[in-house]
Design a protein with these regions (language model features):
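Double-stranded beta-helix
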Residues: 146-215
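Non-heme Fe(II)/2-oxoglutarate
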Residues: 5-8, 12-13, 45-48, 54-57, ...
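Non-heme Fe(II)-dependent double-stranded beta-helix
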Residues: 1-121
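Extracellular structured ligand-interaction cores
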Residues: 26, 130-136, 146, 198-200, ...
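Short, conserved beta-strand element in jelly-roll/cupin
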Residues: 128-144, 202-205, 210, 235-239
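Short edge-strand/loop segments of extracellular domains
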Residues: 112-113, 152-159, 235-241
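Active-site region of the double-stranded beta-helix
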Residues: 99-103, 124-128, 139-148, 154-156
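Histidine-centered catalytic micro-motifs
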Residues: 120-128, 215-219
Length: 265
């Protein structure tokens, strides 16, 4: 077992809890906002998590600053996160992965207003292995003015996606389909000319999207006077065995690590 594909095939063979969902496995998903219910339990957990994250960010409590965002590194002592993981992960496993799954990385941050768009704030793809999924959960109400996530989609529900060369943990992804994993403006415009349109993920706290990391997407910059978006970003991959806790083995923003690869278990 040397490749991500071989690993995932084995993960699926050892899993007994799959359910009908419209997805055969992770390869079918592009972006979905209905994998798990936004019920009272879920929204209550999000609210409690959001309050603690907001206070920690305001108090600069174990944070990492960069040009575009304030990242909370110290989220592990928020008890409701473990309950949130236990609520949503079984649904993601049964309906999409059709295998056990591991939250490999969790980034928790607040966007900064009025910065020059760069990095993730330009149209890009993450160049992750095809077996990786990304989940964003908003902790605040998000509009098109305060840092929403955007993606391309057409009227048939199709999403343009960039292929990756990352087939095993030692592969660095080169050659990249687009230099620096940034999608040139003319390429985005070509997709728009083909009938794709820019869609904004907006909504109240608790709004989420589970997506393939290699679809065309970008973050946006909060405008002056807005309340910047605060959110959780998960990177989730298949796992051979069920963890005792979904909190087990998750990396945060520190120490820095490559979000585009994972080790085979």
């Amino acid at each position: 077992m040397n490749t991500y594909k071989e690993h995932y095939n084995l993960c699926k063979k050892t899993f007994q809890e799959s359910c009908a969902s419209g997805y055969n496995d992770v390869y079918d998903l592009r972006l979905d906002q209905e994998i798990f219910e936004k019920d009272e339990k879920y929204l209550t957990l999000v609210k409690k998590i959001a309050e603690q994250v907001h206070n920690k960010l305001n108090n600069k409590q174990d944070v990492l600053e960069n040009q575009w965002a304030t990242h909370l590194n110290g989220w592990r002592d928020i008890p409701e996160l473990d309950e949130l993981f236990s609520t949503i992960m079984p649904e993601i496993e049964k309906k999409v992965f059709k295998s056990n799954a591991q939250i490999e990385i969790l980034h928790c941050y607040r966007n900064k207003p009025d910065v020059n768009p760069d990095s993730s704030w330009l149209w890009h793809y993450d160049d992750c292995p095809d077996q990786f999924l990304k989940l964003v959960i908003y902790l605040t109400d998000v509009t098109e003015d305060n840092g929403c996530f955007q993606y391309l989609q057409n009227s048939s529900g199709e999403f343009p996606m960039v292929p990756t060369n990352r087939t095993h943990p030692r592969h660095d992804g080169q050659p990249f389909f687009f230099k620096g994993k940034r999608i040139p403006p003319e390429e985005t415009q070509n997709r728009i000319n083909e009938g794709y349109s820019i869609n904004s993920l907006v909504g109240n706290a608790g709004t989420y999207a589970l997506m393939h990391p290699n679809i065309y997407h970008r973050a946006t910059v909060p405008s002056t006077g807005s309340t910047p978006r605060e959110c959780l970003f998960f990177f989730i991959r298949p796992a051979l065995t069920k963890r005792k806790s979904y909190s087990e083995g998750i990396s945060s923003i520190i120490p820095e690590r490559n979000v585009k690869r994972y080790q085979l278990d």
